[in-house]
């Protein structure tokens, strides 16, 4: 609005300039025109200065923004380098960890070899002791015809409830397959593992347990130092080994088997307990899913109701899988842990086996050299001591505690106990409550101590290796943390640089804004000056016109011409009275 009026005023003044030739040299109109020209020139110069200031501010801000981006690029590059250093440190730490683990595995292999030698030595010692002691246990067969055959250092095992044959080999256990003919394969120092109810496969390696499958056809073969495995309810075989326990077949009249220096454990048609001692394994499966745990050189493992395979480790117990199909894989020095039909936890220690509990929650804890075995259909716990095995039978909740070279045996269909003294075989016959105790002169096998020492050394070697690997892993983690920390510092620096650059850019933008405001303010001042110049010219023109008008025609005094134009840009008041102007021009002309 002001600019339009300014242009209009300029046009008018140009018109007045054309008339200036008619005026005298000291004509007031000429002064008006000169004042207007000076005001316009000053305004133009001020506007030019304002535009120059704005351009300068924009250029300076652009430079500062460019500096900000350069700083960001530099910090990003530096951070990338630091991250590379951190990753390299982490890789180096991982290489050390892998190297130490490989070294530890080699060391563990050596220790395992020592352990194997110790086991062989212990087995030889046991054999010598067996030569000294010639003791047989008498085993009673109940409710069915059965044959019993005893070999040197073995007990006679009775098969009850079905026709069965029993064959014992020196240093071997008796293995019974239930529900179907079955086979079991065992290796030295291992337990035999039984899988029931479905077809399963079992593979045993040195230091592992052999696994038995029930309800489908399989074989049972055992080697020295293995446990006895029982299967219930069908025709089966039972074999006993030296230093092992007898296994009872349930659901019918039961059998009792005694071992060298061991007790016979009987369980029939109801829940029962089975306990094993070092060199023994009593394994019961009766009328329900049951499980069996074995100890060093012994233990039989039973799996019921579903297919399962079990793999055992050197010097460990066998692990039972029941109620569902499952496979178990064991590693050196470790046990395989299977959980069935419900969730549970299993914890094991080195040299221990993990034993399965079926159909309910169960926990199992094991100590070195023994396994914990859980019974089926109810939740329970079993704890074993070295040289002992706690075995629970199915259909009832029960616990069993063994002491070394003693067996506590429970009879079926009637309440009965069997207590054996060291060197006793306790045999129970089913259908009546009774006790049988045989006292014999047995020896304790010293090979256990030797094997225990070797196992201890092995465990120490493994722990040492794991500790070393743990240290290396700690170093790797520390290196990684260091790299991350360094990268964090660099990122922090980057963030600081970004913040600084942003602050700087903000300052520059602020300066730019201030410069723009200043330039705008300056331009506003110049425009005000221009308006002031126009107003001044208008005042002079009005004064001139008013003076001429007063001398020429008093009828038009005052009026709008007396309105001062100090406001210049007043909205509705014209700053020149055109009729008075023309009258003044006419009066001036001769």
Swiss-Prot record:
Pfam families per the UniProt record, alphabetical: SBSN_GxHH_rpt
Domain of life: Eukaryota
Tissue: Detected in thymus, uterus and esophagus.
Keywords: Secreted, Signal
Compositionally biased region (Polar residues): 560-570
Main location: secreted
Signal peptide bounds: 1-25
Record-linked InterPro entries: SBSN_GxHH_rpt, Suprabasin
Triggers of expression: Up-regulated in differentiating keratinocytes.
Membrane-crossing residue ranges in chain numbering: none
Region named Disordered: 182-213, 242-266, 297-338, 545-570
Bias kind Low complexity: ranges: 190-200, 243-254, 297-330, 546-559
Subcellular locations according to the entry: Secreted
GO CC entries: extracellular exosome
Lipid metabolism keyword on record: no
Family matches, as PANTHER family: SUPRABASAL-SPECIFIC PROTEIN SUPRABASIN (PTHR23243), SUPRABASIN (PTHR23243:SF3)
Protein name, entry field: Suprabasin
Biological source species: Homo sapiens (Human)
Organism taxonomic ancestry: Eukaryota, Metazoa, Chordata, Craniata, Vertebrata
């Amino acid at each position: 609005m002001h600019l339009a009026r300014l242009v209009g005023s300029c046009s008018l003044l140009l018109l007045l300039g054309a008339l200036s030739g008619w005026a005298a040299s000291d004509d007031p109109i000429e002064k008006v025109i000169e004042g207007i020209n000076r005001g316009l020139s000053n305004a133009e110069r001020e506007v030019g200065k304002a535009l120059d200031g704005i351009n300068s501010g924009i250029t300076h801000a652009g430079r500062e923004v460019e500096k900000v981006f350069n700083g960001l690029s530099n910090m990003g590059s530096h951070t990338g380098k630091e991250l590379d250093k951190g990753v390299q440190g982490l890789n180096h730490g991982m290489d050390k960890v892998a190297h130490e683990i490989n070294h530890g595995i080699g060391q563990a292999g050596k220790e395992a070899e020592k352990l194997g030698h110790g086991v062989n030595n212990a087995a030889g010692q046991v054999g010598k002791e067996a030569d000294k002691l010639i003791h047989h246990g008498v085993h009673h067969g109940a409710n069915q015809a059965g044959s019993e055959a005893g070999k040197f250092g073995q007990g006679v095992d009775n098969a009850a409830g079905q026709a069965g044959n029993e064959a014992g080999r020196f240093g071997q256990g008796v293995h019974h397959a239930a529900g179907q003919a079955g086979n079991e394969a065992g290796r030295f120092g291992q337990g035999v593992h039984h899988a029931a109810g479905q077809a399963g496969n079992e593979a045993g390696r040195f230091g592992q347990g052999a696994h038995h499958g029930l309800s489908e056809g399989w074989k049972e073969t055992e080697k020295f130092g293995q446990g006895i495995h029982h299967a219930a309810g069908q025709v089966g075989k039972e074999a006993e080994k030296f230093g092992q326990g007898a296994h009872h077949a349930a659901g019918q009249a039961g059998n009792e088997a005694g071992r060298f220096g061991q007790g016979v454990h009987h369980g029939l048609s109801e829940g029962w307990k089975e306990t094993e001692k070092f060199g023994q394994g009593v394994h019961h499966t009766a009328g329900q899913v049951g499980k069996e745990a074995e100890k060093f050189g012994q233990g039989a493992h039973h799996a019921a109701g579903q297919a399962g395979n079990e793999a055992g480790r050197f010097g460990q117990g066998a692990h039972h899988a029941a109620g569902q199909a499952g496979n178990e894989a064991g590693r050196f020095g470790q046990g395989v842990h299977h959980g069935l039909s419900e969730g549970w936890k299993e914890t094991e220690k080195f040299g221990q086996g993990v034993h399965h509990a079926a159909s309910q929650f169960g926990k199992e804890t094991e100590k070195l050299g023994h396994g914990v075995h859980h019974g089926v259909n109810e939740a329970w716990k079993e704890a074993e001591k070295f040289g002992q095995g706690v075995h629970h039978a199915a259909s009832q909740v029960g616990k069993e505690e063994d002491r070394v070279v003693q067996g506590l045996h429970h009879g079926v269909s009637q309440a009965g106990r069997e207590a054996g003294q060291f060197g006793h075989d306790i045999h129970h016959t089913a259908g009546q409550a009774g006790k049988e105790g045989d006292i014999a002169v047995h020896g304790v096998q010293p090979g256990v101590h030797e094997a225990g020492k070797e196992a201890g050394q092995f465990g120490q070697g493994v722990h040492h290796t794991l500790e070393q690997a743990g240290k290396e892993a700690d170093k790797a983690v520390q290196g990684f943390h260091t790299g991350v920390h360094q990268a964090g510092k660099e990122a922090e620096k980057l963030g600081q640089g970004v913040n600084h650059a942003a602050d700087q850019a903000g300052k520059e933008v602020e300066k730019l804004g201030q410069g723009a405001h200043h330039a705008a303010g300056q331009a506003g001042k110049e425009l005000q000056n221009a308006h002031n110049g126009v107003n001044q010219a208008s005042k002079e023109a009005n004064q001139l016109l008013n003076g001429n008008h007063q001398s020429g025609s008093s009828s038009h005094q005052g009026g709008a011409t007396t309105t001062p134009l100090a406001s210049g840009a007043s909205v509705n008041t014209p700053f020149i009275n055109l009729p008075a102007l023309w009258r003044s021009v006419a009066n001036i002309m001769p």
